[in-house]
A protein has these predicted regions:
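Transmembrane alpha-helices and adjacent helix-loop boundaries
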Residues: 1-356
Length: 356
């Protein structure tokens, strides 16, 4: 148990333990029908948003790059995951296998997209990087609205509907064929296959991958690039390489989250992955704390549940939501409040001796 003497390792295991405990409590309540229906329907989206927050925190909090197009990678994962799952289920594959395959495929294609986009984008920094990632996120959203995809005995049929005059009938599917993606209508008529358990497993995978990456030599190099780019270059650290690693890993996790998210809806359109979604995920990261993965998990869960909890106050729901966000930001950044909280934290041995 010597490895637990390390403060960072203990913190990571506390994070794992809290997530596992929360899952067990929610799973017990779910199996015993103790969760209201409107909240039960949000369990899979909550897990997907948590993974999205963890993945974006890797780029924004650890690498120090502001990305505003993260929902674009989520949409790639969602659409490729749906196509994979429906195709496998049509071929007779079990639902669990189709779900796992959809997540893997979604992560792969999102990672490839992240690498391709990262080549030109990661030469920029600051506001320029934010603007370009925002543009790429919107481009990805527009591209997926042009896709018409179906599957039959002959395999996949794909039409890229640039002119906007193609329809599902142009796929010429055989009898028994399934139209999966219908252009601007998105995916519709698809049976749902995502589960809360799969979402929990994906959260744990995301936490293990990101936290181990951050604690590794690669993670320290990424943080060195964030803190002082010139100093990092002077000791031989490749700035572009390590920024690319963070960007691609983040994109892959976003794609996996998108595949999980897409499998929770029988109808899914590209409007679910617009600029507002990217900003929402960024809010999770900022409120949870830049570089704080545990905070991202909590913020994503609470802020996803909050609008549903306030649904009874339909006229004032978004007003209350905004007030809560403002109060959290004030409390998080207030030195007085932080000092008050610090009084209740146990002091380290060195600090106690110094006070004596």
């Amino acid at each position: 148990m010597n490895f637990l003497k390390n403060k960072q390792t203990r913190s990571d295991f506390i994070t794992y333990g809290l997530v596992i405990l929360a899952f067990l409590v929610v799973f017990f309540m779910q199996t015993n029908h103790m969760i209201p229906r409107m909240f039960a329907g949000q369990l899979v989206p909550i897990t997907a948003y948590i993974v999205m927050a963890i993945s974006l925190n890797l780029v924004v909090g650890i690498a120090g790059d502001l990305s505003l197009g993260h929902a674009g990678f989520m949409s790639i994962g969602a659409y490729t995951g749906i196509v994979t799952a429906v195709s496998m289920q049509a071929a007779g594959a079990p639902q669990t296998l189709a779900l796992v395959a959809s997540i893997v495929v979604g992560a792969f294609f999102a990672a490839v997209a992240g690498f391709i986009i990262g080549i030109p984008v990661l030469r920029l920094r600051g506001d320029y990087l934010a603007i370009v990632t925002l543009a790429f996120g919107e481009i990805i959203k527009e591209v997926v609205t042009c896709l018409i995809v179906g599957v039959d005995a002959h395999g996949l049929h794909v039409i890229f509907n640039l002119k906007g005059n193609a329809t599902v009938n142009d796929l010429h599917l055989m009898d028994g064929g399934i139209a999966i993606i219908k252009g601007a209508q998105g995916a519709s008529g698809v049976s749902t296959y995502s589960t809360f358990v799969a979402g929990f497993v994906l959260i744990m995978i995301a936490l293990v991958v990101v936290l181990n990456l951050v604690r590794s030599r690669t993670g320290r190099a990424i943080e060195a690039v964030r803190d002082n780019r010139i100093a990092a270059e002077s000791v031989g650290i490749s700035v572009t390489k390590y920024r690319m690693i963070a960007f691609v890993v983040s994109a892959a996790l976003a794609g996996a989250a998108g595949a999980l998210f897409g499998g929770n809806f029988s109808q899914l359109s590209a409007t679910k992955f617009d600029f507002n979604t990217s900003i929402l995920i960024l809010v999770f990261v900022v409120l949870g704390g830049l570089g704080n993965m545990r905070g991202s998990v909590i913020a994503a869960a609470v802020l996803t549940i909050l609008p549903e909890a306030l649904r009874e106050f339909s006229d004032y729901r978004m007003l209350v939501y905004a007030i809560v966000l403002i109060l959290v930001m004030i409390c998080t950044n207030s030195p007085q409040i932080q000092g008050f909280i610090a009084r209740f934290k146990p002091k380290k041995k060195g600090e106690v001796e110094a006070n004596v």
